[in-house]
Amino acid sequence: MPGSVPFATPHAPLARHAGGWGFFVQMFGYGKSNECRGVRMGTPTPIQPTVWVGRVRRFFPLRWATWTSTEGVIMSEKIRNVALVGQGGVGKTMLAEAMLHLSGVTSRLGGHKGTKPTLDYDPEEEKRSFSIKLAMAPVSWGGARLNVIDAPCYPDFIGDAYAAMSAVETAIFVVDAAGDPGAVTTRLWYAAEDLSLARAVFVNRIDRSEAQYDATLAALQERFGQRLGAVTLPWGVGEDFKGIIDVIRMKARHLDDAGKPVECDIPAEYADAAEEARARLCELVVEADDELMLKYLEGDGQLTQEELEGLLAKAIAERIFVPVFAGSCTAEEGVTSLMDDIATYFPSASDFGSVPLVNGDYLDIDEGDDRPVAFVFKVLNDPQNGRLALAKVLAGTVKPGLELICARTRKPERLAHIYRMVGRDMSEVPSAAAGDIVVVPKIAAMAGDTLSVTGKVEAAAFRFPNSLYQVAIEPDKRGTEDKLYSFLEKSCDADPTMSVSRNEDTGQTVISAIGEAQVSVLLDRMAARAGVTAHIVPMRVPYRETIRRTASAQGRHKKQTGGAGQYGDCWLRLEPNPGAGYEFVDEVVGGRIPKGLIPAVDKGVQETMREGVVAGYPMIDVRVACYDGSYHSVDSNEMAFKSAARLGFLKAAGQAEPVVLEPMAKLMVTVPEDYAGSIMGDVSASRGRVEGMEAGERGTTVIQARVPYAEVVDYATRLRSLSRGTGEFTLEIDGYEQVPYDVQAKLAEEWQNRRNAGR
């Protein structure tokens, strides 16, 4: 376009402002000499003011300090770790693909117009057309390394978004210019807030006819607050979309025919909108500096270009300001501006200062520390590359061959090789400094583990979403149970949001996950990689049986076969024993039953109780007294008295008003207050009762209820539907209660049908 000039090439550092990133100081030192570990300072570095933000300490330099690495290692202050998160299907992966392409890492825009994606390489992702795992997309831009993590945000795979956010300093939320921010975006927004992350928003798909940038920005401000402000505006929308208006630099920007970023003067028709957006930007960021704010308020409400750029980094890192960008990932417009600002204004790894430890202390993010520490935030089981641990270096420098100790296991882990990963492709690196993210193959560490020289350093764990979706599975082919369980255990070790267990009460193999799609992917992978197929079966509820009144009966077993016979005779009294479990009492006197045969009576009773008398479920809370009987000196033996005890117990239990008990669940549901009525109605319809309700955080309502477990086996799926994906819940078994008689009759009928069918 006329007047356009080249702007910034991917590898050309942008001009730094006076308040740009400088070298950080140690936690307990207010400054260092010019000769620092691995760094030679070109100019003296002033004392750095320290600012506490949420859970971390951040450092903000007073002026830019030049430096040179003596080892050729990318230093911590030049590393930007960012996670792309947001609602599923809004273009997060395409944004990462655009970053890879524009920075020269890839030669074409992956996943667009039939090209093979770089990041969604898993066959299950190709099959489902959405991301199911996080992927790394590191790029070099503007003199910095941008470690970009593309996080899946389909609800069932949201655990990887939490893992990604635990390893970064900034969360970039991608939203659709024509859609609602969505429940997942809201959930992750508050998770990022709890982690004290800087945040930014990229409004995608401006080139679509239905795009409404202003309305989208207003919706974001209404939901997340007025600290959000535009740093780029769309230069047209729909078919008229040409590029973006850079509010910081007050220039229009677009890609030329060769795909290179260029800038020009702002078109006249956008001048007023740009001035208005800039005024709003100044108003927001000036809160980061009290002196400049006073000057701003007492003056004409303007900031110089130098003052504005000097405040941006501090305002973003302190979460005073959330920058909002406009663009189109498929057109690749607006993406270079985003990368420029990430490199220039977004917090670096060193700006987080320190990370909290389990013991309450803090660990400096210090590349000069001679005791390296690494934090594993994700494990991948890749069929091509094997087990891969994605780790963030928290302190020191890691190199191939280094041996560190895992804080959880106290076992050494040898980092034979370290790699950088782009999608599935890996390239070995000679070292990585504090703040950098690397891939380490073939170590046993799990997500959340901390590796250090002593094994005594343990970073505070981040909380994954609750995995309350449960299903029971069975192999399609008998004899493959062990192979099935082995594959599931290995897979769940790599994914903290999933677990597999054998239910001792029901004997079923149970998978716990976030949602149905997550289990479906797991089973498909098992079939493809292990050759074991399985199917989902109904979850069995661990019902119990008991009695409601006292009853007595005789059990007499007599069998004559021509030789030695069998004879056993006992009288049993059954009594309710609420909350005390099973108890057996020997009340026989006068040698009516020899002492050596009394244990056989006890054993016969317990074996019968395991089978139940009403619906085939184990009996609990019964006191059994054996108070009389008789025996034969020749024909009485252990087997005979076990059989007699069985007969006596069945008779007495039938007279003692046997009932079925069902497990009760203590349910706590957190939903936006608009959905509270639906949740309470569902609890009532599920034979439950609401026991309490209170206001929660961020406009939510917390509902406490007690519900039969049988009614909430599928509650994860039901709550997602009731709350449109906005609800969360916890559930725990909380005792047993008698089932209604109609439910008991149904269970008894099902048991009888199974017996008649020989099952």
Language-model segments: what does each one mean?
Residues 3-4, 38-40:
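N-terminal, intrinsically disordered charge-dense segments
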Residues 21, 28-30, 46, 53-56:
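Low-complexity, intrinsically disordered Ser/Thr/Pro- and acidic-rich segments
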Residues 5, 12-15, 43-44, 48, ...:
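Short, low-complexity intrinsically disordered segments enriched in A/P/G/S/L with frequent Arg
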Residues 34-37, 48, 59, 63-759:
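Structural and coupling elements of P-loop NTPases
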Residues 18-19, 243:
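Coil-to-alpha-helix initiation sites in intrinsically disordered, low-complexity, charged segments
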Residues 5-8, 12, 18, 25, ...:
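Short hydrophobic alpha-helical segments enriched in small aliphatic residues
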